């Protein structure tokens, strides 16, 4: 490995190893980052489901995205002091076909989602429970897990497809937890890797029978085309531009069919905006330049701006991260 790659690897490892195992265990799985309601995590699961089943579950995936939008709106409400009566007024307004709960404007995507469901439904449950009258009240686990239960039941009778899937920078099984909980993991041949030994210790502790290894995305220990699919979240912005290109090259090398890549900080400009932060980076990546890197490896990249997707499909204008993009990347077949 080149000296620059070694140095950046060491810096990245130190950046994560300074955190406690408990901090790493809960990092990126709470609040808007909870993979049950985080749109990019949901899009990743939908990517895998589509690879296995085509468009068979298209209607269910649409409902799951709507559920995420409604639940995230509720989470924002709960960050303010809220009384049970206020939630009940929202439900009353929805039942009456209204869009106003005594001065509280109900977003159109919330009203439209309610209209697609037969009552009683999960939205009745979301707005009927009684939060503690303090700020930042959590939504009960059983409500957050609504689609976890649905997917687990829907997929229960499916035979394992054994498509091989790699997740570099898997953290403490951050997304894998929900592949397992949603009944998707058993259909896949999954392998997770992370540079941080504490993350891998956490992941193995939670899932001793799953395959997790300490590994470097800059030097993946696998043959060319070893995996059918790959998914990766929140990695590339933390790399120098030179190392970013190496990481993408390695992922493309070992992936035979398709990749789903989640980015948290991208823009439509022509150049990457490089921002070193401590021992690593917090860059704003150019969509066009990043697509071009994938295309060097005979990959076709479809870039989805999450905010635009949610605006156009659901009329949702209040997503928490306007800079989030998801790339769906497929290997081009020789002509």
Regions found by a protein language model. Give the residues of each.
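Structured loop/turn residues at beta-strand edges in well-structured enzyme cores
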Residues: 160, 225, 253-254
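A conserved beta-strand element that flanks and buttresses the S-adenosyl-L-methionine
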Residues: 231
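Short catalytic micro-motifs in class I SAM-dependent methyltransferases
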Residues: 234-238
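Conserved acidic residues
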Residues: 163, 228, 257
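A short glycine-rich, Lys/Arg-flanked "PGG" loop and its adjoining helix->strand segment in the class I
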Residues: 245-257
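Class I (Rossmann-like) S-adenosyl-L-methionine-dependent methyltransferase catalytic domain
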Residues: 1-221, 242-246, 260-335
């Amino acid at each position: 490995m080149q000296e620059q790659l070694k140095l950046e690897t060491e810096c990245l490892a130190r950046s994560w190893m300074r955190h406690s195992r408990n901090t790493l265990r809960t990092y990126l799985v709470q609040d808007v980052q909870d993979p049950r309601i985080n749109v990019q995590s949901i899009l990743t699961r939908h990517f895998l489901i589509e690879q296995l089943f085509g468009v068979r579950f298209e209607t269910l995936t649409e409902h799951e995205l709507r559920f995420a939008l409604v639940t995230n709106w509720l989470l924002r409400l709960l960050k303010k002091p809220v009384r049970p009566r206020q939630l009940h007024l929202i439900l009353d307004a929805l039942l009456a076909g209204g869009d106003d709960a005594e001065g509280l404007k109900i977003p159109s995507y919330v009203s439209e989602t309610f209209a697609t469901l037969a009552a009683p439904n999960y939205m009745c449950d979301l707005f009927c429970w009684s939060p503690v009258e303090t700020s930042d009240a959590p939504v009960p686990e059983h409500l957050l897990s609504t689609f976890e239960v649905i997917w687990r039941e829907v997929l229960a009778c499916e035979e394992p497809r054994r498509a091989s899937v790699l997740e570099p920078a898997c953290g403490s099984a951050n997304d894998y937890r929900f592949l397992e909980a949603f009944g998707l993991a058993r259909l896949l041949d999954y392998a997770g890797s992370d540079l941080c030994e504490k993350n891998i210790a956490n992941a193995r502790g939670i899932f001793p029978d799953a395959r997790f290894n300490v590994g470097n995305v800059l030097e993946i220990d696998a043959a060319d085309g070893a995996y059918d699919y790959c998914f990766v979240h929140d990695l590339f912005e933390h790399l120098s531009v030179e190392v970013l290109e190496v990481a993408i090259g390695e992922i493309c090398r070992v992936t035979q069919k398709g990749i789903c890549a989640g980015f948290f900080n991208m823009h439509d400009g022509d150049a990457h905006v490089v921002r070193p932060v401590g021992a690593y980076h917090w860059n704003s990546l150019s969509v066009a330049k990043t697509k071009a890197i994938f295309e060097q490896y005979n990959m076709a990249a479809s870039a989805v701006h999450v905010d635009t997707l949610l605006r156009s499909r659901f009329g949702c204008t209040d997503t928490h991260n306007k800079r989030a993009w998801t790339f769906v990347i497929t290997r081009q077949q020789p002509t």
